[in-house]
Swiss-Prot record:
Residues 1-21 form the signal peptide. GO terms for cellular component: extracellular region. Disulfide bonds join C24-C44, C37-C65, C50-C54, C69-C80, C81-C86. CDD domains: TFP_snake_toxin. Belongs to the three-finger toxin family. Long-chain subfamily. Type II alpha-neurotoxin sub-subfamily. One of its GO terms (molecular function) is toxin activity. Monomer in solution, homodimer in crystal state. Is identical to Alpha-bungarotoxin (A31) from B.candidus (AC Q7T3J2). Binds with high affinity to muscular (tested on Torpedo marmorata, Kd=0.4 nM) and neuronal (tested on chimeric alpha-7/CHRNA7, Kd=0.95 nM) nicotinic acetylcholine receptor (nAChR) and inhibits acetylcholine from binding to the receptor, thereby impairing neuromuscular and neuronal transmission. It also shows an activity on GABA(A) receptors. It antagonises GABA-activated currents with high potency when tested on primary hippocampal neurons. This is Alpha-bungarotoxin.
């Protein structure tokens, strides 16, 4: 009986650890919202760059979830992080 109980406890701990998901801000929806990332995507990212309207509108911002930090192009700023809601829009208060 003790062996069965110990086995159940170990299995529960392993399953809880494997089931961790991160919450990231995303620009895939309008307005910007926080979403639970799919399994395997355990990073939040923020990409920023200037387009033709940068001087009047500011930088374009892309937020989302990723399995690995997106590659940075020469004209982009890319940051990645691994805690819930760690990638807020620059004009948005963290939270």
């Amino acid at each position: 009986m003790k062996t069965l109980l110990l086995t159940l406890v170990v299995v529960t701990i392993v399953c809880l650890d494997l089931g961790y998901t991160i919450v990231c801000h995303t620009t895939a929806t309008s307005p910007i919202s926080a979403v639970t990332c799919p399994p395997g995507e355990n990073l939040c990212y923020r990409k920023m760059w200037c387009d033709a309207f940068c001087s009047s509108r500011g930088k374009v911002v892309e937020l989302g979830c990723a399995a690995t930090c997106p590659s940075k192009k020469p004209y982009e700023e890319v940051t990645c992080c691994s805690t819930d809601k760690c990638n807020p829009h620059p004009k948005q208060r963290p939270g």
